[in-house]
């Protein structure tokens, strides 16, 4: 679920040719193509579905429920929702910080690094780890597929090493005739993980703080605090820790 900023609203208005005057920054969220908001009691209200035609040539926002005026719903702002959930969020943060301290002490001979994508989960993980250990190094794996804003962000992000592949994604497709599918997502295997695996010392003990959560998928629902990517890390002595898996 992503907060909807003015830039995205401008994109929607420009591409759908709809005024969408009832939408504004600071109150609405995009969740799996659904634009929704929450009232001040925390109840969810679904307003629009964002639909892209198969041709990718048309985008449309369709109202899901009859709201004569969305303004009639006493919507909570993002900040008000944070205040509504403040106790829960504070406890989540405290639990994560305690886990980070515990695992750092347990693996005290390991070198801590934080793989980051500039997305919400890895940025939250980085924030929590650096809250306790400010000098912890971050690593950004350049997939060659990220948007311009991501690259602008990573170039100014402190203490972050950018790991670049030998070939970009589309060069790889052309050279090796590899096409990604749901069951062969080689962009992740080769670019998001593979570049890091090829450049880090397999014999050095790294402690990797990973921004993965149990609620992301059925596969990740069973992950525990300590996790090792045996399939993609290969024969290494690396250890993964998931500080936000319960978020």
Please tell me what each predicted stretch does.
Residues 1-247:
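Nucleotide-activated chemistry modules centered on ATP-dependent adenylation/adenylyltransferase
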